[in-house]
């Protein structure tokens, strides 16, 4: 196993200048005067051939830390007339926009170094820089073959294609440095895909790996992910060098009784005031629709130079906005998630987060966009929308200040990505099975890959399922494998990558089209679920291909709000801290809370009142107590499980519990889930007894979640994604794009067969849903925690304050914002009446 350790030595300017060639040293002295912290730790170590992961804030000279040792080597070769026509430095970024940035940011210093060299009488050969992505034309690729760049900038997908390009791959064999930027954005299947590409590249080239990351935890795991198994990695962590200021500012004192229009008015007035106090402000919302809404209202208030930036806008528009931001021509820019990553956007004075960013690392990435230089303070303001949001943001801001960051999740042993790379490898040469297995296991996400899973994927690729029109891509014989047929290369080129084709799903009622929903929303549906579309309420009956069947229902409350798919989930570590905070608030006075959490008196009071109300009405569920509450409505019974585990883990537990209860009570059980718990909703003639609750806590969670998944839309959708990644279903064939409708239809034809034979791609679909979507590991961890707590099962006259959002959010599509406020106010009045009655007894 390779060693992972933190670098302790910070080199002086003189020590770094010693290793730099004269033109580079002279240029650096003129332009920068002195090295920044990440440069002091990293440059010399990279020069000495060490793999390095650099974690430092935006504007700290991180990119130059990564490139300078390599550029210095290229200048040295150029001075010695030894610079060959091949690629020396490979830079990989998940963002195409970032690639264009880097190209610009490299060409400028290289030109300046030439000018300095000329001045001091040194002639240099030109160091070429080029970008190769899906936007690169055939003629540009041809030019690269004739005159290769010395520095190549690319994306994970384009690297996978380049590895299999017979001529171009030869140019990769001399690579000395590989730089992976924004590695924190690659802790997903795209990153898993890249980790295998790097191992395949390592077979033909011996290179140093350099990773660049924003604040992420744990860095030791990211380091292993960067370098793979058996290699050393050294971590430069200077994220603490940047001063950060985070404040939680509430637009109103009272979220319950202040009318919506008033909250809205005060919110936009607050935003206007903050914008006017700063030169450039960046506002993050949590949904794309909110982005446009905020921009509209700010313009109405007379705020000038307002722009939006999100993934639904055209690339041209986004680039134009980035350019304007850089030039300081925008007063305020509103974004959803698209500006979280490191595209250079110049100087931002203030970052405002509307609503909770749901994780400390996301908050730090967003707020880190302000105070672009290392010595400047990053300034962020979080504006909560309700009482739960207020509590969450106070805990989040505190965790951010003390540097407590939520853990990342890197998918493991993804069999669909493995299948794709095995096809790519078969195109390179004939492989010995064990040699290929050992190469795959060097990639960190595959270190524990079983030989059985590996052979199952090879056998699938060699056997195909011809009766289902899935043809073999490789041959496998005598412990060796290679490519099969001429069309395999084209299939690989046209279908490589991990990002599935997304589409809208048609909604059909009584044979008629009534609208469409996002696929991400459709995959959450289970039979009997109720949702709202175009102001009408529908019950989900089932789905086939790219259509879902529904029937219109009346007097039924929705179980899934329409915005569910756009919501960010609460990080598990932060959720656990919220539980501890609840207990702390109950046992502290207002002054103690105010001081420790650096909040104003009215915020501390609002939080204290919220906890007291809950405590007087029921109990406060925290890290020692579990609350399960039951209350009845006219037609149904609600059972609310106050589990603070984040929405993904809660959905796993809710599915497991609902599956079990529906079997023993022989009825349909609906669920409604949020970050703070879930509701099981039963018909009025069914009841969950205390004995049933005891049984729930002895449940086989995984078995029940799997049973639930097998009945829901998510399995069909995710199987298509996995099957396209694993080349069982093609997205493009013979220069033709295959529609998502067709892909989905093919997936459903294959799903039954794959389930029957326990196919590796079926197993991968279940793994992806359980581990990557539903966060099963944390769900099981939480399940064990609550078993050790004191459990309170209370029958209540109406929902407790902590349950308001869960009860109302399910209905928030049928009711307008104003009615939602009224509904919460009504529930609150009932709570206060009950408390006062209790007080009189």
Curated annotation (Swiss-Prot):
It comes from the Archaea. Residues 43-234 form the Helicase ATP-binding domain. This is ATP-dependent helicase Lhr-Core. InterPro entries: ATP-dep_Helicase (IPR052511), DEAD/DEAH_assoc (IPR013701), DEAD/DEAH_box_helicase_dom (IPR011545), Helicase_ATP-bd (IPR014001), Helicase_C-like (IPR001650), Lhr-like_ATP-dep_RNA_helic_prd (IPR017170), Lhr_WH_dom (IPR045628), P-loop_NTPase (IPR027417). The record marks 499 as: Wedges between bases of the loading strand. ATP binds at residues 39, 62-63, 181-182, 352, 369, 372. SMART domains: DEXDc, HELICc. Residues 417-500 are annotated as: WH domain. It comes from Methanocaldococcus jannaschii (strain ATCC 43067 / DSM 2661 / JAL-1 / JCM 10045 / NBRC 100440). Keywords: ATP-binding, DNA damage, DNA repair, DNA-binding, Helicase, Hydrolase, Isomerase, Nucleotide-binding. Composed of 2 helicase domains, a winged-helix (WH) domain, and Lhr-specific domain 4. Its EC number is 5.6.2.4.
């Amino acid at each position: 196993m390779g060693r992972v350790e933190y670098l302790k030595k910070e080199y002086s300017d003189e020590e770094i200048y010693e290793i730099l060639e004269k033109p580079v040293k002279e240029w650096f002295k003129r332009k920068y005067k002195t090295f920044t912290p990440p440069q002091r730790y990293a440059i010399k170590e990279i020069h000495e051939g060490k793999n390095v992961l650099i974690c430092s804030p935006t504007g700290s000279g991180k990119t130059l830390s990564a490139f300078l040792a390599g550029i210095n080597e290229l200048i040295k070769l150029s001075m010695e007339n030894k610079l060959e026509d091949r690629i020396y430095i490979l830079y990989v970024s998940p963002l195409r926009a970032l690639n264009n940035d880097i190209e610009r940011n490299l060409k400028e210093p290289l030109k300046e170094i030439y000018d300095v060299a000329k001045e001091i009488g040194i002639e240099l050969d030109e160091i070429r820089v080029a970008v190769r992505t899906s936007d690169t034309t055939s003629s540009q690729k041809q030019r690269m073959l004739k005159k290769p760049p010395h520095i190549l900038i690319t994306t994970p997908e384009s690297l996978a294609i380049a590895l299999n390009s017979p001529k171009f791959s030869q140019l990769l064999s001399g690579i000395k440095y590989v730089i992976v930027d924004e590695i924190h954005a690659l802790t997903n299947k795209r990153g898993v895909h890249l980790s295998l590409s790097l191992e395949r590249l390592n077979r033909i080239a011996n290179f140093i790996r350099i990773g660049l990351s924003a604040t992420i935890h744990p860095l030791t795991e990211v380091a292993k992910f960067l370098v793979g198994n058996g290699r050393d990695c050294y971590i430069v962590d200077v994220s603490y060098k940047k001063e950060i200021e985070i404040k939680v500012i509430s637009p109103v004192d009272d979220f319950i009784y202040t009318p919506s229009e008033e909250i809205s008015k005060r919110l936009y007035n607050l935003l206007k005031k903050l914008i006017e106090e700063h030169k450039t402000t960046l506002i993050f919302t949590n949904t794309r629709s909110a982005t446009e809404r905020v921009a509209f209202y700010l313009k109405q208030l007379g705020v000038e130079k307002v722009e939006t930036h999100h993934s639904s806008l055209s690339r041209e528009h986004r680039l134009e906005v980035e350019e304007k931001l850089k030039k300081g021509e925008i007063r305020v820019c509103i974004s959803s998630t698209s500006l979280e990553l490191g595209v250079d956007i110049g100087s931002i004075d203030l970052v405002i987060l509307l609503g909770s960013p749901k994780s400390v690392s996301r908050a730090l990435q967003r707020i880190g966009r302000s105070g672009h230089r290392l010595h400047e303070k990053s300034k962020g303001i979080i504006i909560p929308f309700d009482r739960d949001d207020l509590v969450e943001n106070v805990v989040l801001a505190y965790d951010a200040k003390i540097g407590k960051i939520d853990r990342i999740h890197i998918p493991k042993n993804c069999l669909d990505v493995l299948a794709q790379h095995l096809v790519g490898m078969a195109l390179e040469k004939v492989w010995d099975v064990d040699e290929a297995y050992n190469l795959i296991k060097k990639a960190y996400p595959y270190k524990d890959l079983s030989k059985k899973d590996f052979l199952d994927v090879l056998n699938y690729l060699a056997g195909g399922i011809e009766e289902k029109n899935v043809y073999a891509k490789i041959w496998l014989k005598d412990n060796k494998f290679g490519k099969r047929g001429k069309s395999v290369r084209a299939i690989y080129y046209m279908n490589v990558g991990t990002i599935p084709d997304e589409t809208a799903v048609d909604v059909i009622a009584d044979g008629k089209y009534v609208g469409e929903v996002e696929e991400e929303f459709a995959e959450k549906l289970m039979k009997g679920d109720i949702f709202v579309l175009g102001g009408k309420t529908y019950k989900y009956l089932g789905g086939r291909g790219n259509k879902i069947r529904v029937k219109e229902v009346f007097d039924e409350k929705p179980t899934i709000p329409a915005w569910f798919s756009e919501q960010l989930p609460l990080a598990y570590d932060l959720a656990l801290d919220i539980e501890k905070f609840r207990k702390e608030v109950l046992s502290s006075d207002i002054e103690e809370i105010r001081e420790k959490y650096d909040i104003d008196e009215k915020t501390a009071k609002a939080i204290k009142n919220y906890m007291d109300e809950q405590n007087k009405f029921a109990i406060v569920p925290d890290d020692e107590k579990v609350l399960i509450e039951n209350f009845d409505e006219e037609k149904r019974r609600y059972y609310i499980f106050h589990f603070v585990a984040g929405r993904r883990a809660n959905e796993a537990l809710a599915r497991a519990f609902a599956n079990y209860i529906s079997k023993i009570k022989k009825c349909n059980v609906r669920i409604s889930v949020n970050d703070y718990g879930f509701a099981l909703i039963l018909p009025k003639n069914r009841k969950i007894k205390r004995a049933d609750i005891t049984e729930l806590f002895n449940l086989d969670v995984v078995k029940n979640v799997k049973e639930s998944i097998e009945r829901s839309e998510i399995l069909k959708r995710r199987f298509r994604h996995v099957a396209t990644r694993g080349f069982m279903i093609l997205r493009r064939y013979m220069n033709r794009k295959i529609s998502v409708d067709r892909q989905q239809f093919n997936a459903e034809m294959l799903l039954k067969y794959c389930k029957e034979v326990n196919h590796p791609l079926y197993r991968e679909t279940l793994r992806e849903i359980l581990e990557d979507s539903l966060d099963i590991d944390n769900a099981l961890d939480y399940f064990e925690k609550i078993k050790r707590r004191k459990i309170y099962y209370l029958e209540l006259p109406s929902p407790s304050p902590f349950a308001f959002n869960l009860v109302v959010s399910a209905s928030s599509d049928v009711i307008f914002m104003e009615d939602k406020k009224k509904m919460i106010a009504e529930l609150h009045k009932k709570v206060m009446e009950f408390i006062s009655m209790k007080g009189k007894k």
